[in-house]
Amino acid sequence: MVTGPEKPGIGFPSVLDSAYKDYKRHMKVSDIMSRGVFTTTADTPMAKAVRIMGERHIGSLIVMKFMSPLAIVTERDVLSKVLAGGLDLETTLVEDVMSYPLIKICPTLEIREAARTMIHKKGRLAVFECGELTGVITASDLIREMPDAPETSLGVDEFMTKEVVSVSEDEPVATVAGIMGKKRIGSVIVERDGKPAGIFTERDLLSKFLVFEKSLDTPVGKAASSPLKTAAAGISIHEAAKIMAAQHVRRLPLMKKKQIYGIITARDLVEAYAR
C-alpha cells in the first residue's frame, strides 16, 4: 500500500515535550543549586548572623571553623532555639544553636535523590565537589525545578497540614514569634475581623524586624504579607510547586468552600516528591 508523505510537524511537539519532561526528571544537583554561598563563623554572635540573613533575604548560613565548612545555621534556629528558648541574640553564639554535621551531597546526584536525602537527613544540603563547597540546595530550589511526572501528579491534600495556626492582626510580633518558635512552624495566618487577611513568616521576622532591631511590640498585621496568596485544595503537587515558584512563596494556604482547608509548604512538596 502506497501512502503519501507525512504532514510536517505531526508528532514533533509531543516528541519535544517528552524529551523535555525526561530531561527535567533526570536533572542533576549542579543544574539547580544556589552557587552563591553565604558563610559565617562558629564564634559569631547570632545577632550578626541574623543581620546577614535578613539583609540578604536568605534562610541559612554555612558555618566555617578553621577555614572549613562545619555546620549550618538557619532562620528556624533563630525562632525555635534563640527566641523561643529565651536566649539573647547578642550573647548567643552561632555554635550554640547551629546544626551539625553538615549534610553533604555530590553535584552529579539526580534531584529526586537530593530530595530524598533532604527529607531523610532533615535539613538543607551542602554541595561539595572534590572536597570544595560549591553550592547549597534548599526546598525552594527543588520546587522551582520540580518535574511534571507521575510522582508529582498526586494531590496536595495528602501532604498538607490541616491544623493551620491563625492569629489576630492586633497580636504583637513578639507573641507571634513565640508561638511560631514553640510550635516549630514557619508561618501563621493573620486574621482581620475573623477572616484570613495575610501571612507572617519567619523570613518576615528576620528581614523586617530583627535585622533593623525594630520593636517586636508592633502589631503583626502591620508586617504581614497581604493579600493572602492561596490555591484550591485538590491541586497536584506539580501545580502547587509551579504556583509557589511563580509567586516566590514557600507556603501556600489551600482553600475549599471559601475556607482555609490546610497549608502546604515547600518542604511538604519535597517530601511528597521524594517518595
Please place each PLM-identified region on the residue numbering.
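Tandem CBS (Cystathionine beta-synthase) repeat/Bateman regulatory domains
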Residues: M1-R275
